[in-house]
Amino acid sequence: MALCRAIAGRWLVAGALGLVLVAGSGPAAMQVPAGTGAPDRPTFEAFVARLREDAIGRGISEETASAALDALTPLEVVVQRDRAQAEFVETVDQYIARRLTARFVRQAQAQADTHRALLRRIEARYGVPGSLVVAVWGLESNFGRFSGVRPVPQALATLAWEGRRGQFFREELFAALAILDEGAISPGDMKGSWAGAMGQPQFMPSSYLDHAVDFDGDGRRDIWRSTPDVLASIAHYLQNHGWQSGERWGRPVRVAGAAVEAVSGVPLRDAGCRAVRELSAPRRLDQWQRLGVRTAEGHALPTATREASLLKAGRRHYLVYRNYEAVLGYNCAHAYALTITQLADRIRGR
């Protein structure tokens, strides 16, 4: 799972595939609270020694704590990435266009075909369509081709010591140690992004503990090497964040003429991460119809009474349902969620 953080009023999407500063997108599912680094922080060696003591106090075995933490040195590249300003800004439309290339869509469709039987079993268990699972897999790690090369314990210890979001990364480090204690992977093989997002789904360690599953039945929740575990874990995460089986995520719509002023009277949400607060309060489809909202082709909206929120992202408007918010739970940025959902639609041939 990608990790986002606030920088200069915008939001940085950080995952194994790199960084992009997305204007108008929101914080991630695990928003990292900013803090102020202490000028009198201990040396890295002293800090890690205290982490080791605290980890053992939390029930982590001495063997795991020693294997993961002994002789660690800070990763300067991690500190630089954490502090860096992105060098370019992408709009939502640019973000989507740069990722949803014809070649990438074909690759995603091929992956869905290759794993069709597995994805059907996963959908039967978790209610999440295989097209959506493959879309997340593709955007997070290019279908498992690149899931990060940074040693996760070292990266998290560095970020915890660096201090600006120290408590968050300290807790993630303890979660990583719990994973090592579980025996899912060795310390040397626990690799991920500079921010500690791990494996092919790019889960933070705490998300691994909450959502990773052993779908191949080998006794380990292996999101690094086991394709069944990877894809099922993505589905389980989305299910746990509210994905409703058989429902769609939303649709592009047309808001033109008098409808522009009419919809402006609908208030925005007042709770949730930034991306959620950029959604309108929900209204029934027939209410949006009366306000002048139409399908992207200019036709009447469906007559269903389900509720939807209006979203203006880039140059387009969308009516989005609860399932869209489940995708925001993976990474709370509209550029990300719209890329995922539109890729899933293209995989399904819509």
Language model features by range: what are they?
Residues M1-G15:
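Bacterial N-terminal signal peptides that target proteins for export
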Residues V13-G24:
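Bacterial N-terminal signal peptides
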Residues Q31-E123:
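An acidic, Gly/Ser/Thr/Pro-rich helix-cap/linker signature
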Residues A65-V89, W137-S141, P151-P153, P252-E261:
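Acidic helix-start/capping segments at beta-turn-to-alpha-helix junctions
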Residues T73-P74, E140-G144, A197, V255, ...:
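Solvent-exposed loop/turn segments at secondary-structure junctions
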Residues V92-S233, Q239, W249:
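Acidic/His-rich structured neighborhood in mature extracellular/periplasmic domains
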Residues R220-S280:
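Ligand-binding pocket segment of bilobal, Venus flytrap-like solute-binding proteins
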Residues A259-R350:
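C-terminal soluble interaction/assembly domains
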